Amino acid sequence: MSELAASLLSRVILPRPGEPLDVRKLYLEESTTNARRAHAPTRTSLQIGAESEVSFATYFNAFPASYWRRWTTCKSVVLRVQVTGAGRVDVYRTKATGARIFVEGHDFTGTEDQPAAVETEVVLQPFEDGGWVWFDITTDTAVTLHSGGWYATSPAPGTANIAVGIPTFNRPADCVNALRELTADPLVDQVIGAVIVPDQGERKVRDHPDFPAAAARLGSRLSIHDQPNLGGSGGYSRVMYEALKNTDCQQILFMDDDIRLEPDSILRVLAMHRFAKAPMLVGGQMLNLQEPSHLHIMGEVVDRSIFMWTAAPHAEYDHDFAEYPLNDNNSRSKLLHRRIDVDYNGWWTCMIPRQVAEELGQPLPLFIKWDDADYGLRAAEHGYPTVTLPGAAIWHMAWSDKDDAIDWQAYFHLRNRLVVAAMHWDGPKAQVIGLVRSHLKATLKHLACLEYSTVAIQNKAIDDFLAGPEHIFSILESALPQVHRIRKSYPDAVVLPAASELPPPLHKNKAMKPPVNPLVIGYRLARGIMHNLTAANPQHHRRPEFNVPTQDARWFLLCTVDGATVTTADGCGVVYRQRDRAKMFALLWQSLRRQRQLLKRFEEMRRIYRDALPTLSSKQKWETALLPAANQEPEHG
């Protein structure tokens, strides 16, 4: 290692063998004039043809300098590459506007016996509001990049000793793949001190045929803990409980079981954790497992006007790096150069310092949804910020492939939103009328779309919230079965294999654009109201009027029908939504009564939940839920 490059922050990494072009663009950009495609013999080396140009202005290899400027003690970073052949390395940076600035360039000539080491130090001072740094390689002869990386100029403070926690539920193959990836790279393997797997399913990870090999590489570091299905919050709470009680690990890394891991992401969040000015949560970003070049979001916040998660200012959902590269003049790409500050990070990849976990306590008993947001907000109240670090990411199933806004998860969305709002919603915008108004709007939309089961379980969500924090903990395991029982009585919650299971629709589908003109919106709304005041035609409950694709199932179409099939978000089945005037009015009145109670009692519930936070987040309280597993010896790999 050179005198300048003292501690690795981020390696240059290359695509896996056989990756498609759109995924390759997350790692490198090749000039269209190159005679042949660059080849990566390993994950950290690249063979480039003669008279070619390759840019590392990419998601995984550009350096997010503004984040390191804002959150760490680093004053500068060093690019260090080892190359053979003849060519040139040019270093560029950007401003927060996306404007590109040349930094410096170096010609190089290296041989197999003596590779050339090219180093460039980049001062971080100009990156207050945004900006990245990257390098390009232009070749004269064939060139091999043997290694490259971004380095700090001083040794990393603290200790690298991570407890990785992967709760799993009936995904043994996915979990085994994640375990295998943890030991696939020596640098990643050596920083992992423990791997904790709470197994909450019936199909056990240890029964998978590939488990013994994956477990053998982890050895005594791996522990499997069987426990009831307590959801993600119960799984992650077990991870934190075991990490604090039975390890000396200084970092706790939460990860989902159903992800595809980029192992270097672990090293990158660890590096930021170690160089951070003060303890903080460091999270990775999420790429779309089905469209791998698509980034879910640069970062998220909680909208304090309605207390709902949303994109952070200047961040947009679903950015496609294959279509809009980082170094692109498109307005969408320019937004990527701003530093995005967040309220929380999803627990698909999130590193929590041991010190923070010891001070804040356990996650809330929310089963799923909002537990990650709560912890980020709770940390901020204790002076611990959260950063969502670009270039550190995993691939996860996109939310667009799920019906979680209308299926059983809708219960947890609303109930837990209310719980977390009661815990953390303060300031001039903390007026529950905004939240209730947004819920009323959503309720009317659900009823117009014949999503009666959604309204029914959301009514239960309000009831359970108003019943108080002790009740919330008591139903940690039982709430989901109760929600399933409620949904079974509504046709819109019964999934059929295909629309062909029913008689053919009475009408062919017609294209309907969303209304934007206020007069047209008013007309469609009036038609829908008048239609819903009349009794439904029983014939349309035996034979649907339309077969509606999921993307077309909007209020302005469904509010004037009595029966229609709607395809599920994953495309694997349909539900037969049927209008029922009596049921609709009953659900509406029940919802309105509960919303009135929310308005009346929210201040009271705010005090009750805040008083209960120390108990809800305590190890002692969580032991009562984890007791069946706590009385067992964990199984080690």
Curated annotation (Swiss-Prot):
GO cellular component entries: cytosol; plasma membrane
Q: Which residues bind Mn(2+)?
A: D256, D258, H396
What GO terms describe the biological role, i.e. biological process, of this protein? capsule polysaccharide biosynthetic process; cell wall macromolecule biosynthetic process; cell wall organization; cell wall polysaccharide biosynthetic process; lipopolysaccharide biosynthetic process; mycolate cell wall layer assembly; UDP-D-galactose metabolic process
Q: What is the first-listed, main subcellular location in coarse terms?
A: membrane
* Catalytic function, reaction form: beta-D-galactofuranosyl-(1->5)-beta-D-galactofuranosyl-(1->4)-alpha-L-rhamnosyl-(1->3)-N-acetyl-alpha-D-glucosaminyl-diphospho-trans,octa-cis-decaprenol + 28 UDP-alpha-D-galactofuranose = [beta-D-galactofuranosyl-(1->5)-beta-D-galactofuranosyl-(1->6)]14-beta-D-galactofuranosyl-(1->5)-beta-D-galactofuranosyl-(1->4)-alpha-L-rhamnopyranosyl-(1->3)-N-acetyl-alpha-D-glucosaminyl-diphospho-trans,octa-cis-decaprenol + 28 UDP + 28 H(+)
> Which compartments does it reside in?
Cell membrane
Q: Which GO terms describe its molecular function?
A: glycosyltransferase activity; lipopolysaccharide-1,5-galactosyltransferase activity; lipopolysaccharide-1,6-galactosyltransferase activity; metal ion binding; transferase activity; UDP-galactosyltransferase activity
Q: What is this protein called?
A: Galactofuranosyltransferase GlfT2
Question: Lineage from the top down?
Answer: Bacteria, Bacillati, Actinomycetota, Actinomycetes, Mycobacteriales
